[in-house]
Amino acid sequence: MGRSLKKGPFIADSLLRKLEKQNADDDKSVIKTWSRASTILPMMIGHTIAVHNGRSHVPVFITEQMVGHKLGEFAPTRTFKGHIKDKKGGR
């Protein structure tokens, strides 16, 4: 279930300030953020945002298809190492 239209999308204030400053300066350097819950807006297209996954910052390049999704969707928090092979073998 999505967020109410009258409320608008959530974006962290610090992230919004950094984006507006970079857009004004025509700067495209990497922005570090811990805000995985922030919604991707059209003004973010073309930026690289380093999203924290609990251990490190994962660089995410924002494209047009990502608009409306959350930043945390593109920085996985768990690593899948595969299923363990059957130890019994061929008895």
Curated annotation (Swiss-Prot):
InterPro entries: Ribosomal_uS19, Ribosomal_uS19_bac-type, Ribosomal_uS19_CS, Ribosomal_uS19_SF. GO terms for molecular function: rRNA binding; structural constituent of ribosome. The keyword rRNA-binding applies. One of its GO terms (cellular component) is small ribosomal subunit. It comes from the Bacteria. It holds the Pfam family Ribosomal_S19. Keywords: Ribonucleoprotein, Ribosomal protein, RNA-binding, rRNA-binding. GO terms for biological process: ribosomal small subunit assembly; translation. Protein S19 forms a complex with S13 that binds strongly to the 16S ribosomal RNA. Belongs to the universal ribosomal protein uS19 family. This is Small ribosomal subunit protein uS19. The gene is rpsS.
